[in-house]
Regions:
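Crotonase-fold acyl-CoA enzyme core
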Residues: 7, 109-204
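Short hydrophobic/charged patches on amphipathic alpha-helices used for structural packing
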Residues: 12, 47, 105-108, 131
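Short strand->helix junction
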Residues: 32-33, 65, 157, 199
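Amphipathic coiled-coil/heptad-repeat helices and related helical stalk/stem segments
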Residues: 39, 43, 104, 127, ...
């Protein structure tokens, strides 16, 4: 592939490739890169579209925030255009709900493939699904202004987008439980000290 080929650009996700390095960018800074089912499908597609020559994948978000997490439109009765609402999914069968969550999780699981090293470059807010997306990567380089938080419990949800397993592996069970149960912010100094962040760099 030639330098900086654009492989995919849809639904708030852009994938570019420069030889052995791919960059996946969340491209909706006006909404702080809030996440939706369409974005999750685009992330999963980005993983499938990676050329075999890629060895490093950098994940970043445009604007001041990496990702503010799930778009609040998910909790509106009408949900997202063309998507079943979360309320409708909750009323459906357990098997259907499990299948839908498994589909969403495809956006988060490919970052730990054994043929690549994935690096999340995280600035500003990384909340809920944004925190879980950063946790999906092998490494995290964070700006001094980073704010991680697992806010699902305050919404009556569980963090079911694969984030709890790597969180426990990084910081231990008790601290992971406390972070999830309280929904508090984890800032750069604590993130580096506890192993959530591999490196802290100045914010732009």
């Amino acid at each position: 592939m030639t330098s900086l080929d654009s492989v995919l650009d849809k639904d708030g996700v852009r994938l570019t490739v420069d030889d052995a390095v791919a960059t996946v960018t969340l491209t909706n800074p006006a909404k702080r890169n809030a996440q939706s089912p369409a974005l999750w499908r685009a992330l999963a597609e980005a993983g499938r579209a990676l050329p075999g020559s890629v060895r490093i994948v950098v994940l970043r978000g445009e604007g001041k925030s990496f990702s503010a997490g799930l778009d609040r439109q998910a909790f509106a009765p009408e949900g997202f255009d063309g998507e079943p609402s979360f309320l409708d999914m909750a009323r459906g069968s357990e098997a259907d709900l499990d299948a839908t969550i498994a589909e969403y999780q495809e956006a988060f699981i490919w970052w730990r493939r054994n043929d690549i090293v994935s690096i999340a470059a995280v600035q500003g807010h990384a909340i809920g699904a944004g925190f879980q997306l950063a946790l999906a990567c092998d490494l995290r380089i964070v700006a001094e202004d980073v704010q991680f938080a697992m806010r699902e419990t305050s919404l009556g949800l569980v963090p079911d987008l694969t984030g709890t397993h790597p969180l426990v592996n990084l910081v231990g069970y008790a601290r992971a439980l406390e972070i999830c149960a309280t929904g508090r912010f984890v800032h750069a100094e604590e993130a580096e000290r506890t192993g959530l962040a591999n490196l802290v760099v100045p914010a732009d």
